[in-house]
C-alpha cells in the first residue's frame, strides 16, 4: 500500500474539497485515463485494488500510471469512546481527489483493452469516474478557449 515515508505532522485537519482540480487534469503519460467527476477521498488500499484490477486484465502488455498519492492522514477514535480526550489514532492514508483529476493512465495496449481495464478499475473506486482518451481532453481544452 502507498503511504508517505515520513511526515512533519502526523495529524491533519479534514480540509475541504471545494472546486475543481487545477493540477493533474491532463493525460501526460498514457493514452487513456480515469477522470474523477465528483470530489472524494481515495484510500491507499482502494488505489492498490484498482491497480491490481488493471494489471491483471492487461497481463504482460501495456503500462499503468498512478497519478494520485495518498498523503493525507485520517484519524479515528474507537467505537464506544466518549468525546474529547484528544484526537484519535491514525487509521489510513487518503488521496484528496477533486472533479477533473486524472487518477490513472494506461498506455501500450489496444483501445478496447484499455477501456475495459479502466472500467474494471472504476468499480474499485469510491467516486463516480469517466474514462477518457488523450484526444478527448485535448479536444475539450481547445473548444473552451
UniProtKB/Swiss-Prot annotation:
<dbReference type="InterPro" id="IPR000114">
    <property type="entry name" value="Ribosomal_uL16_bact-type"/>
</dbReference>
<dbReference type="GO" id="GO:0022625">
    <property type="term" value="C:cytosolic large ribosomal subunit"/>
</dbReference>
<keyword id="KW-0699">rRNA-binding</keyword>
<comment type="subunit">
    <text>Part of the 50S ribosomal subunit.</text>
</comment>
<dbReference type="Pfam" id="PF00252">
    <property type="entry name" value="Ribosomal_L16"/>
</dbReference>
<dbReference type="GO" id="GO:0019843">
    <property type="term" value="F:rRNA binding"/>
</dbReference>
<dbReference type="GO" id="GO:0006412">
    <property type="term" value="P:translation"/>
</dbReference>
<dbReference type="InterPro" id="IPR047873">
    <property type="entry name" value="Ribosomal_uL16"/>
</dbReference>
<keyword id="KW-0689">Ribosomal protein</keyword>
<dbReference type="GO" id="GO:0000049">
    <property type="term" value="F:tRNA binding"/>
</dbReference>
<keyword id="KW-0687">Ribonucleoprotein</keyword>
<dbReference type="GO" id="GO:0003735">
    <property type="term" value="F:structural constituent of ribosome"/>
</dbReference>
<comment type="function">
    <text>Binds 23S rRNA and is also seen to make contacts with the A and possibly P site tRNAs.</text>
</comment>
<keyword id="KW-0694">RNA-binding</keyword>
<dbReference type="InterPro" id="IPR036920">
    <property type="entry name" value="Ribosomal_uL16_sf"/>
</dbReference>
<dbReference type="InterPro" id="IPR016180">
    <property type="entry name" value="Ribosomal_uL16_dom"/>
</dbReference>
<dbReference type="InterPro" id="IPR020798">
    <property type="entry name" value="Ribosomal_uL16_CS"/>
</dbReference>
<comment type="similarity">
    <text>Belongs to the universal ribosomal protein uL16 family.</text>
</comment>
<protein>
    <recommendedName>
        <fullName>Large ribosomal subunit protein uL16</fullName>
    </recommendedName>
</protein>
<keyword id="KW-0820">tRNA-binding</keyword>
Amino acid at each position: 500500500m502507498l503511504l508517505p515515508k515520513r511526515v512533519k505532522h502526523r495529524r491533519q485537519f479534514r480540509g475541504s474539497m471545494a472546486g475543481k482540480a487545477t493540477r493533474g487534469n491532463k493525460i501526460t503519460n498514457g493514452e487513456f485515463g480515469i477522470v474523477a467527476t465528483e470530489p472524494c477521498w481515495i484510500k491507499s488500499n482502494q488505489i492498490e485494488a484498482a491497480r491490481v484490477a488493471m494489471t491483471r486484465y492487461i497481463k504482460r502488455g501495456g503500462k499503468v500510471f498512478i497519478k494520485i498519492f495518498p498523503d493525507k492522514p485520517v484519524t479515528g477514535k474507537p467505537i464506544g469512546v466518549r468525546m474529547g480526550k484528544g484526537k484519535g489514532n491514525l487509521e489510513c492514508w487518503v488521496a484528496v481527489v477533486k472533479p477533473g483529476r486524472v487518477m490513472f493512465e494506461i498506455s501500450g495496449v489496444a483501445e478496447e483493452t484499455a477501456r475495459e481495464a479502466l472500467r474494471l478499475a472504476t468499480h474499485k473506486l469510491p467516486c463516480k469516474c469517466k474514462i477518457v482518451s488523450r484526444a478527448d481532453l485535448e479536444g475539450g481544452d481547445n473548444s473552451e478557449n
